[in-house]
Swiss-Prot record:
GO terms for biological process: cell redox homeostasis; cytochrome complex assembly. Belongs to the thioredoxin family. DsbD subfamily. It comes from Escherichia coli O6:K15:H31 (strain 536 / UPEC). It is found in: Cell inner membrane. Residues 434-565 form the Thioredoxin domain. This is Thiol:disulfide interchange protein DsbD. The lineage of its organism: Bacteria, Pseudomonadati, Pseudomonadota, Gammaproteobacteria, Enterobacterales. It is a multi-pass membrane protein. PANTHER family: THIOL:DISULFIDE INTERCHANGE PROTEIN DSBD.
Length: 565
């Protein structure tokens, strides 16, 4: 008896194992979106928590989460920082795994108010779901002063500003600005004014007065940084809008052009004259007078300092961080003041000779400012085009530096020239791949010629017009990475094209995910993309031939031979 039971158990186990061996390779092993991303919510007066329980092997896109109130007012929602995910077609994206809890503060909600929540995710196996939309009913909430505060994300999840350089770079920029033609020649004169024309001061006294002057200048810059950062904090959400980012990028580009000498950017001459007169009334050689002179000097912007200062101020406004804003401008002023302190203590013998090299320093800072619009535009146009902009900037800078270095006659400059030329050649690679690589691929690959359909009626009409031929329907969307992999790697393969030579090819682009797209996906019982369906000559689908998820050319060719009706 025991032997029979044991034999029966083995038979049942072997049946399930062998059944798995004969499962169709294209059959869906993916769960519905509601199971992949289990959504829930809980409201307690002004506090609303949105929760996603994300199944293992699946993830949500951070940038695809949208929250829209109806008959309600909510505080600005700050999405927690996710983890980075990278693919060939969309580059780096922030995603959420496992679990996501999003607190929302409801300032006011009328009777019948709702919250529309839209989100989208994919599976690691190469399967993406259309955008999901959930409607959250809200309990009536009366506005009060406490609820008007912005929602706070737990501290460990607070997103930090992603900065292209740290505040310490401001110190180096300040030192570099000191060697521009508008600043460096003025240092001996400023040194004499600070010391009050006294030539027999002790080194310690001279250093103290110069340090006080620099601190006065730094105070002005720090105050500017705090004010701009505070203003940026109030308008942080607006400053992240694509149109605002594009506008700021244009402003940064214009500031860079002023460093290239296309036009002069400075305070009005009348205002500069008034500030200069105020500074001249102060008594040089005294700590109080020197401090006021430094504070006023911070407001007098020369053509060489206006553009970099404006660029840093606009950049600080983007961060919205007051500590960063004040610290960055303080270090910038300190960097400008260090050469002045050295000249005051050690004399003009440390001062390099004036010459064309100062104009080259000014031009170099123009390229530094140009890095900021690239950083901003990268958020709008994506990482792929952002890399191309960085490539173009690198080619321009290293190319300019190489041409400039050709004027030098010293032997060791040959090594520098080789390094600059090599850097330019390395920088041009992304542009070369874009200009020649993709074009070459497009010329050598012949893609399938699909007939586009949009609605269920158009699909039915196309099946009738097939006149007995087998039909393949490809469901495609721009947000589907695996769909693009099908186009690039599978549909371009000659063996696949040969196998589909006698097949009517249809394609439905459901990128918009509008009502017609949703109706088509529902009619076909499709969970997500990529999904490829096969119909026989009578317009009946062969469910066993359906493909979900990516297949390479070899696997897809074998699937066509085995499954296509």
């Amino acid at each position: 008896m025991a032997q029979r039971i044991f034999t029966l158990i083995l038979l049942l186990c072997s049946t399930s194992v062998f059944a798995g061996l004969f499962d169709a390779p294209g059959r869906s092993q993916f769960v519905p979106a509601d199971q992949a991303f289990a959504f829930d919510f809980q409201q307690n007066q002004h506090d609303l928590n949105l929760t996603w329980q994300i199944k293992d092997g699946y993830y949500l896109y951070r940038k695809q989460i949208r929250i829209t109130p109806e008959h309600a007012k909510i505080a600005d929602v700050q999405l927690p920082q996710g983890v980075w995910h990278e693919d060939e077609f969309y580059g780096k994206s922030e995603i959420y795994r496992d679990r996501l809890t999003l607190p929302v503060t409801i300032n006011q909600a009328s009777a019948g108010a709702t919250l529309t929540v839209t989100y989208q995710g994919c599976a690691d196996a190469g399967f993406c779901y259309p955008p999901e939309t959930k409607t959250v009913p809200l309990s009536e909430v009366v506005a009060n002063n406490e609820a008007s505060q912005p929602v706070s994300v737990p501290q460990q999840e607070q997103p930090t500003a992603q900065l292209p350089f740290s505040a310490l770079w401001a110190l180096l920029i300040g030192i570099g600005i000191a060697f521009t033609p508008c600043v460096l020649p003025m240092y001996p004169l400023i040194s004499g004014i600070v010391l009050g024309g006294k030539q027999r001061l002790s080194t310690a006294r001279a250093l103290l007065l110069t340090f006080i002057y620099v601190q006065g200048m730094a105070l002005t810059y720090t105050a500017l940084g705090l004010v701009v950062a505070a203003a940026g904090l109030q308008f942080q959400a607006a400053l992240q809008h694509p149109y605002v980012l594009i506008g700021l990028a244009i402003v940064f580009t214009l500031l860079a052009m002023s460093m290239f000498g296309l036009f002069t950017l400075q305070l009005p001459s009348s205002l500069q004259t008034r500030l200069t007169l105020m500074s001249n009334r102060q008594q040089g050689g005294s700590p109080g007078g020197v401090f006021i002179m430094g504070a006023i000097a911070g407001l007098i912007c020369s053509p060489c300092t206006t553009a970099p200062l404006s660029a840093i101020l606009l950049y600080i406004a983007q961060s919205g961080n007051m500590w960063l804003g004040g610290g960055t401008l303080y270090l910038y002023a300190l960097g400008m003041g260090l050469p002045l302190m050295l000249i005051t203590v050690f004399g003009n013998r440390l001062l390099p000779k004036s010459g064309p090299w100062m104009e080259q320093v000014k031009t170099a800072f123009g390229f530094v400012i140009l890095a900021l619009p690239v950083f901003l535009l990268e958020r709008v146009i994506g990482d792929i085009w952002g890399l191309r902009l960085w490539s173009a900037l690198g080619v321009a800078f290293f190319g300019w530096a190489f041409i400039t270095s050709l004027q030098a006659k010293r032997g060791w400059m040959r090594v520098v020239q080789i390094i600059l030329l090599a850097a330019a050649l390395v920088s041009v690679r992304p542009l070369q791949d874009w200009a020649f690589g993709e074009t070459h691929t497009a010329q050598t690959q012949t893609h399938l010629n699909f007939t586009q359909i949009k609605t269920v009626d158009e699909l039915n009409q196309a099946l009738v017009e097939a006149k007995g031929k087998p039909v393949m329907l490809d469901l495609y969307a721009d947000w589907c990475v695996a769909c693009k992999e099908f186009e690039k790697y599978t549909f371009s393969d000659p063996q696949v094209q040969k196998a589909l030579a006698d097949t009517v090819l249809l394609q439905a682009n459901v990128t918009a995910n509008d009502a017609q797209d949703v109706a088509l996906l529902k009619h076909l019982n499709v969970l997500g993309l990529p999904t490829i369906l096969f119909f026989d000559g009578q317009g009946q689908e062969h469910p066993q031939a359906r493909v979900t998820g990516f297949m390479d050319a070899e696997t897809f060719s074998a699937h066509l031979r085995d499954r296509q009706p």
